């Protein structure tokens, strides 16, 4: 797994509401979260597909 995928989800201090995806190392899945727009980390992807590709998630049912 890419090291960025092990980072915790960070919403950040700003108040924007961007739908993003992050890799949840507990569930071993990419999950949606709302990103505030600043102060995040590299575990922050624009699409579910990008998150799964970078973090090596095997999608169920595909």
Swiss-Prot record:
InterPro entries, per database record: Kunitz_BPTI, Kunitz_BPTI_sf, Prtase_inh_Kunz-CS, TFPI/VKTCI-like
Keyword Transmembrane: no
Highest taxon, organism lineage: Eukaryota
GO molecular function, one term: serine-type endopeptidase inhibitor activity
Keywords assigned by UniProt, alphabetized: Disulfide bond, Nematocyst, Protease inhibitor, Secreted, Serine protease inhibitor
Residues in BPTI/Kunitz inhibitor domain copies: 5-55
Family listed: Belongs to the venom Kunitz-type family. Sea anemone type 2 potassium channel toxin subfamily.
Protein name per its UniProtKB record: KappaPI-actitoxin-Avd3a
Species: Anemonia sulcata
